[in-house]
Amino acid sequence: MDFLEIVGQVPLKGGVEISGAKNSALPILAATLLSQQEVKIKSLPQVVDIKAMALLLQNLGASLEWLDPNTLQICAKSLHHTEATYDLVRKMRASILVLGPLLARFKECLVSLPGGCAIGARPVDLHLKAMQQLGAEIKIEQGYIHAKAPKGLKGNDILFDKISVTGTENALMAASLAKGITRIINAAKEPEIAQLCAFLQSGGVEIEGVGSSELKIRGVESDALNLKDIQIIPDRIEAGTYLCVGAITNSQLKINRIIPNHLQAITDKLIEIGFSLDIQENSIEIYPAKQRQAFEITTKEYPGFPTDMQAQFMALATQCLGTSVIEETLFENRFMHASELQRLGASISLKTNVATISGSTELTGSDVMATDLRASSALILAALVAKGVSRVHRIYHLDRGYERLENKINALGAKVVRLKEK
């Protein structure tokens, strides 16, 4: 098992290029199961979750060829079975995304209940109800979802009681091959969903309301779905994380290959804290702040402040003047990084879903343990400003979602080394 050793308080400067968005790539990879045509997906990040999804597609019988480290050619014409086994699915929760495509195309599938980060319950009920609304029969037996629709899926209204990103994506993909018209009400509005819509539209699926909370989909036949090659959008959470690298170290950094509109909740908050930003068409440069002010954050669905950035901003809060407050409204049990930040010297108090962080704190290097993907990046941020050497353990969480993070940070001047546990 690997860990990162980080020397703190090293000056940083330069630029970093953002990788493709893991959270856009995963549903698009799953969507290739809908079609019998060959398609190329470009700008795939080389992270564990993408490799796991590619392996799952291959296990189902899809033909895969890596044309370069970030471009995958896929043809799902000759799938030989429709069972997503526990061994493959347990590694990440996003594997539930194969449920909609397999059910829609083959009228029956068996998908293991998924794994991934241990953040709250994250129930799959919303996915299952969506499939049932389209006419599927669902049973859960021995840890597997058995879904079938002998006469095929039929368009219908799907109302989500709670906004769900992956639930919306699964419903979108299933509706793409359903007969008639489907309306998804209270749909998630993330940019990653908009790109999935664009991918499905490229194959002939008619979708209205892209970017809104109500989507209207007119399905097509599988053999008529001709998906076009696509380039994955930049990862807004990775971009936000590197903006926080600049913010916590109070450095001048340029974040390249981004879509600034996707980052507005993050950049608005950084400006409120006291940073100057030069926002261009596909880059943002952050400049050192004369004084960093404490802040308040409440996580919300897009376009609100992303839950995937609250851990990084908690680390940043330790260096701001005054007391900051972060309220997590989307997931339970998502403050596990707080106790590890405390090991570095952070002053944080927790009350249910609210964290209060005292600022202007001198952090000291220590051994800390990553508990999930975004927590791992928060610990690295804190280690960059801590006095002395820190070691971040269990970075397999980090490798699920960040491409070559230590290489990118080291290119800015940091001293980060990946080592093996003894």
From Swiss-Prot:
The modification 2-(S-cysteinyl)pyruvic acid O-phosphothioketal is found at C117. Phosphoenolpyruvate binds at K22, N23. Keywords: Cell cycle, Cell division, Cell shape, Cell wall biogenesis/degradation, Cytoplasm, Peptidoglycan synthesis, Pyruvate, Transferase. It is found in: Cytoplasm. Pathway: Cell wall biogenesis; peptidoglycan biosynthesis. One of its GO terms (molecular function) is UDP-N-acetylglucosamine 1-carboxyvinyltransferase activity. Its main location: cytoplasm. The keyword Lipoprotein does not apply. It is an enzyme of class 2 (transferase). Its EC number is 2.5.1.7. UDP-N-acetyl-alpha-D-glucosamine binds at R93, R122, P123, V124, D125, L126, D308, L330. InterPro entries: Enolpyruvate_Tfrase_dom (IPR001986), Enolpyruvate_Tfrase_sf (IPR036968), MurA_subfamily (IPR050068), RNA3'P_cycl/enolpyr_Trfase_a/b (IPR013792), UDP_GlcNAc_COvinyl_MurA (IPR005750). Cell wall formation. Adds enolpyruvyl to UDP-N-acetylglucosamine. HAMAP family: MurA (MF_00111). Belongs to the EPSP synthase family. MurA subfamily. This is UDP-N-acetylglucosamine 1-carboxyvinyltransferase. It comes from Helicobacter pylori (strain G27).
